[in-house]
Each structure stands twice: as C-alpha cells, then as structure tokens.
Amino acid sequence: MAGHTTADYISHHLTFLTTGQGFWNVHLDTLFFSLVSGVLFLFFFYRTASKATSGVPGKFQCLVEMLVEWVDGVVKDNIHGSDVRHQIGSLALTIFCWVFVMNAIDLIPVDFPPQFAELLGIHYLRAVPTADISATLGMSVCVFALIIFYTIKSKGLGGFVKEYTLHPFNHWAFIPVNFLLEAVTLLAKPISLAFRLFGNMYAGELIFVLIAVMYMADNIIPQVLGIPLHLIWAIFHILVITLQAFIFMMLTVVYLSIAYNKSDH
C-alpha cells in the first residue's frame, strides 16, 4: 500500500495507472478493464448464441433472448424508421451490457484489484472504468457523433444546417442566436450523459472506499459496523449499476430517435 494514513489509503485507491503526460496522459487501467468487460460480454453472447436451440432453451439463452426482446421493444417505441432500427437496437444492446459489466466491477472488494496489482509490481490500479470521466466522456462523444450522423442521414446536410440555424426563430436575421441556442442544447447531451454515469459510479466507488476505511480503525465498533454497511451498500449498488446502464442506453436511444425522427422545421 502506498501509505498508512486514511488520506493515503483513499488517495491510493483513487489514483489511476497512467502513462504519458498532459493531453497524452492515458489511463491504462481504464483501457484494460474496459476491454476485458467488452470481451466478457462478447464471449458470453457468442457462447450462448453458438449453443442456442429451438427446443427448450437453457437459462443463459433465456436471459439473452429476454434482453434482446426488451431492448428491441425499447427501440421500436422510439425509432420510427425500420431501416435503422436494427442498427440502433444492436448499439443499444451493446451499450447496456457493456456499461453494466463495467459498472459491476465496482462490486469487487476495493482492496482486491490493487493488492493483486501490487504482486505484479503495479503500484496504482482503479478497476471501474465508468468511474473515470475520460471513459464516460469517450462513450458520450461517440453518441454525439452518431447524433450528427443520423440527423444528416434523415434530413440531409441542408436539413441539418437548417435545423441548427432556422430554429426556433425562422428568419435569417436570427441565425446566430438560433445556432447558439441549438449548439448549447446539442453539446449538453453528451456532457450530461458522461457526467451522470461518471458521477454515480465515482460516488459509489468512493463510498466503498470509505466503508473499507472503517476496517482500519483502532476501535472495534467501526470495524464491526463496516461488515453490515458494506453488505447493505453492495445490495443497493446492484440497483445503481443496473439503473445507470439502463439510463445511458435509454438516453442514447432517445437522442438518436430525436435526431432521426424529428421533422424539418
């Protein structure tokens, strides 16, 4: 462990494994656990699909079919164009499952990942990718790019320009004002998407760290109280990680449906 005081302990658990400097600073632990989460999700779905049967399905096949049908229903309720429904449906399913797996890493006891990393000579390690703003912002930027893409796909480049220059005031004199208002609204979508997921997961991770600090106390009372508190928060956090994955997926679908479905002004 990097330090022996409470402040050192908390700081150690909130420090990323990084490489590079300044703008080129890369959080290696975030990249690693993001990729591992994606591989686990793909492996689970591939394994289930390869063993799928038209007869009595297994429990994993039932789970996957329920997920696919549920996400497909969500997308159908929001996307009117059948030509893009399958594309956005696949994206929504990937987002929900991938974000859920990344969030679920937070249920691993906070000391396990850094202690295992210490055995490999790695002094700092944060295991929850969605507690890193760079990860959530990266995903949100991708959603932002898709919003632009589907707006142009649905309305054409001319319709895209018109939408952000002649609304809400349909007069050429208000083009600067319209553009400013629409640009703020558009940019707020990925920013709010990123910070909502990051804020909830960072807070959840920090609470687990603070509960772990109780085990370091000299008094036996906080040590004993730490056990039920950890269990209660872990159970509640299962709801949080699921809800945050759903919210990120749902907002992505809603934003893309607005981009694709909205009529020209």
Curated annotation (Swiss-Prot):
The keyword NADP does not apply. It is found in: Cell inner membrane. One of its GO terms (biological process) is proton motive force-driven plasma membrane ATP synthesis. Keywords: ATP synthesis, Cell inner membrane, Cell membrane, CF(0), Hydrogen ion transport, Ion transport, Membrane, Transmembrane, Transmembrane helix, Transport. GO terms for cellular component: plasma membrane; proton-transporting ATP synthase complex. Key component of the proton channel; it plays a direct role in the translocation of protons across the membrane. This is ATP synthase subunit a. The gene is atpB.
